[in-house]
UniProtKB/Swiss-Prot annotation:
Name of this chain's protein: 2,3-bisphosphoglycerate-independent phosphoglycerate mutase
Origin species: Trichodesmium erythraeum (strain IMS101)
Residues that bind Mn(2+) 2: D15, S65, D439, H440
Protein family (similarity comment): Belongs to the BPG-independent phosphoglycerate mutase family.
Domain of life: Bacteria
Length: 532
């Protein structure tokens, strides 16, 4: 080992790799994963919580990548936007929200339309249908009569055909309160792209902004026709159902609370220098987003970002250490923006590298995704021996798991397992420490009890494996490190700080998963286990 070189702690996040013993519909159990299997047997390991209250969500609510990475990076249980917004609606406080009051006032003064745009879903990952129903109630209370709902159907974080029930729920509510109509319907495949596939966004945008009489049938009838044609919720082609285009003078509320898949459509509406596709600027237009999608967007924000101090990346930086983050396109925001508590800018000493995801319609067409290239990027960072912390996310189990294609998901997990072996060899050569975790479950549950494809996340526990190595071999002293049970994602950052022998700040309320142990600190800040 070179003098002054660093043996890093490498946090390996297997996105969507939940734990479930039953093999039925379990791509992880069915797949051949010799590396993860041998690591699970040979090294300190435990299962940790990644859903519900353990990550700041309601009890029983499945976790997701945004929530998972927020908790991992913050080192504390982070109250999630789903809970914040639901509480504001249930308590009636949303009526007093200054941004909500402002947009309602503008619509009333201009005698214009209010448009409610968002994912109509009970999944609670990007949005919740109850928030839309709450906004409809607010509009009625404010005396706004012309309200258009631009429904984005899910089928990815929920059952592929659950949208029918949700749209009927919305139709019932609008009939009950006497205002509102579903004006357009778009599958999230189009309206919520996040990979700059602007042709998809364009289809949704144009349907929302070009007026017409619509199909002449209800939104729920339209969805039933789509099902009959073999098109499920996620892939519904954007279509106008009833009159009500977004026009100058109108107000728009985008009620998704998760930013990553709401940014591109928002850009199309509000970015002055937008060049994704040709479109006419709609002015004046009061545009409100439930949360901050991007600090540069000229919009109202109903629920401002929570500020987190002394998160993992910040602590690493404050101690003069360098760190590296890498993921492919689909998960890049998670290891950067979300991992850093919603901050776009990297900390001092934080390097990043994006690996392009394959440009395919569905990831079951390319289940390997860009895992091999990503692994090479991570190995190169390890070899430099300048980083104390390296964070890498493998997207395959989650992204392919969302397709509901079992064979492709098996291929995906096998690809990740193969790459994991290569990465661990690189880590072992520099005496590094690897921590393997997942942010939530997915690929371990591909079929429901009736054999139908399951495309959503799960509430299952996720793995935690600690691998400490010497210069020439992986085993080292890692097999003797005792781990505690009942941990959660908030405990990952304190664990990393303990390994790096850095003090845990008071704001970090998580607890190291490593039980009390004595360490001898190497000059390169990687500890070696010396005794219990």
């Amino acid at each position: 080992m070179k003098n002054g070189s660093i043996s890093p702690v490498v946090l390996i996040i297997l996105d969507g790799w939940g734990y479930r013993e039953e093999k039925y519909g379990n791509a992880i159990a069915v797949g051949k994963t010799p590396n993860i299997d041998s690591l699970w047997q040979a090294y300190p390991r435990t299962l940790i919580q990644a859903s519900g209250k353990a990550v700041g969500l309601p009890e029983g609510q499945m976790g997701n990548s945004e929530v998972g990475h927020l908790n991992i990076g913050a080192g504390r249980v982070v109250p999630q936007e789903l809970v914040r917004i639901s509480d504001a609606i249930e308590d009636g406080l949303i009526v007093q929200n200054q941004a909500i009051k402002k947009i309602c006032q503008d619509v009333i003064e201009r005698n214009s339309k209010l448009h409610l745009v968002g994912l109509c879903s009970s999944g609670g990952v990007h949005s919740h249908v109850n928030h839309l129903l709450g906004l409809l109630d607010v509009a009625k209370a404010k005396g706004i009569s012309d309200v258009c709902v631009h429904a984005i159907t899910d089928g990815r974080d929920t059952n592929p055909k659950s949208g029918l029930h949700v749209l009927k729920q919305i139709e019932y509510h609008t009939n009950q309160i006497g205002i509102g109509r579903i004006a357009t319907v778009s599958g999230r495949y189009y309206a919520m792209d996040r990979d700059k596939r602007w042709d998809r966004i364009q289809k949704a945008y144009e349907v929302m902004t070009q007026d017409g009489y619509g199909t002449g049938c209800s939104a729920s009838d339209l969805l039933q026709k789509s099902y009959a044609e073999g098109i499920t919720d996620e892939f519904v082609l954007p279509v106008r159902v009833a009159p009500g285009a977004v026009e100058p003078g109108d107000g728009v509320i985008f009620f998704n609370f998760r930013p990553d898949r709401a940014r591109q459509l928002t850009q199309a509406f509000v970015a002055p220098d937008f060049n994704g596709f040709e479109r006419q600027t709609i002015q004046p237009l009061t545009f409100l987003t439930f949360t901050q999608y991007d600090s540069s967007f000229p919009v109202l924000v109903a629920f401002e970002p929570q500020n987190f101090n002394n998160i993992l990346g910040q602590v690493i930086s404050q101690h003069g250490l360098r760190q590296f983050r890498t993921a492919e396109t689909e998960k890049y925001a998670h290891v950067t923006y979300f991992f850093n508590g919603g901050l776009e800018q990297p900390f001092e000493g934080e390097d990043r590298e994006l690996v392009q995801s394959p440009m395919v319609s569905h990831y079951d067409e390319a289940p390997e995704m860009s895992a091999e290239d990503l692994t090479e990027v991570a190995i190169a960072a390890v070899k430099k021996q300048i980083y104390s912390l390296i964070v890498i996310n493998y997207a395959n189990p989650d992204m392919v798991g969302h397709t509901g294609a079992m064979d492709a998901a098996v291929n995906a997990v096998q690809t990740v397992d193969h790459c994991l072996g290569k990465l661990l060899q690189g880590i072992s050569k520099v005496g590094g420490t690897a921590i393997i975790i997942a942010d939530h479950g997915n690929a371990e549950y591909m079929w429901d009890e009736d054999g139908n494809p399951w495309t959503a996340h799960t509430t299952n526990l996720v793995p935690f494996i600690l691998i400490e190595g010497e210069v020439s071999k992986i085993p080292g002293h890692g097999t003797k490190v005792p781990l505690r049970e009942n941990g959660c994602l908030a405990d990952i950052a304190p664990t990393i700080l303990e390994i790096l022998n850095l003090p845990q700040p008071a704001e970090m309320t998580g607890k190291s998963i490593i039980k009390k142990a004595e360490y001898e600190l190497k000059p390169n800040r990687t500890p070696v286990r010396v005794g219990l």
